[in-house]
């Protein structure tokens, strides 16, 4: 249970921007406020079921691919030194419900995929959210292949083509 709480806490700031936006800042509980406010906020942003067996099993295919091909973000844990029980433990490899030792990370997979998309991908439309932290890894595309990349202003991980400005 303590590992689930620690990992959910580390996920909180990333998930806040992945699925929310700056308007959600007002909902952040004040320092020194009641613990229930923090629990409610975490439930709203991350979900209290985030580290449940059901969620871990549901996301296992993604976590496996993140651990072996996609990579993942690293949480900033410097401010938590001395209070964590699992420092640097929040990693996709720790979330997969089986031994990951036989499956190393291959850092070449995604650059190869992106290279193919840019060189050969035709009629591809990529829509990213301006505020989605995953957009820092946005693929490049080539207009000569009739492919385009757009960032939805103020958008998050749920950005979609209909929400793009009319000019795009």
Model-flagged regions — what are they?
Residues 138-140, 163-164:
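Short coil/turn segments at secondary-structure boundaries
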Residues 153-168:
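Catalytic active-site module of serine/aspartate enzymes centered on a nucleophile-bearing elbow/loop
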Residues 120, 126-128:
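Short beta-strand/loop motif that positions the catalytic acidic residue
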Residues 108-119:
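The feature captures the conserved acid-bearing segment of alpha/beta-hydrolase catalytic domains
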Residues 58-60, 117-120, 141-144:
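Extracellular/periplasmic catalytic domains that process cell-envelope and extracellular macromolecules
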Residues 126, 149-151:
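Conserved beta-strand scaffold positions in the cores of enzyme catalytic domains, especially
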Residues 1-108:
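Alpha/beta-hydrolase fold active-site neighborhood
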Residues 77-78, 128, 133-138:
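Conserved alpha/beta-hydrolase "acid-adjacent" motif
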């Amino acid at each position: 249970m303590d590992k689930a709480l620690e990992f959910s806490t580390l996920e909180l700031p990333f998930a806040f921007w992945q699925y929310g936006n700056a308007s959600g800042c007002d909902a952040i509980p004040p320092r020194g406020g009641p613990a229930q406010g923090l629990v409610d906020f975490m439930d709203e942003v991350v979900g209290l079921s985030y580290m449940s067996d059901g969620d871990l099993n549901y996301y296992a295919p993604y976590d496996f691919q993140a651990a072996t091909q996609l990579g993942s973000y690293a949480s900033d844990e410097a401010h938590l030194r001395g209070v964590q029980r699992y420092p640097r433990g929040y990693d996709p490899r720790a979330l997969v419900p089986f031994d990951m030792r036989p499956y190393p990370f291959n850092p070449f997979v995604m650059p190869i995929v992106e290279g193919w998309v840019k060189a050969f991908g035709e009629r591809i439309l990529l829509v990213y959210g301006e505020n989605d932290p995953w957009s820092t890894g946005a693929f490049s595309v080539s207009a000569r292949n009739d492919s385009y990349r757009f960032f939805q202003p103020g958008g998050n991980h749920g950005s979609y083509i209909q929400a793009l400005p009319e000019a795009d």
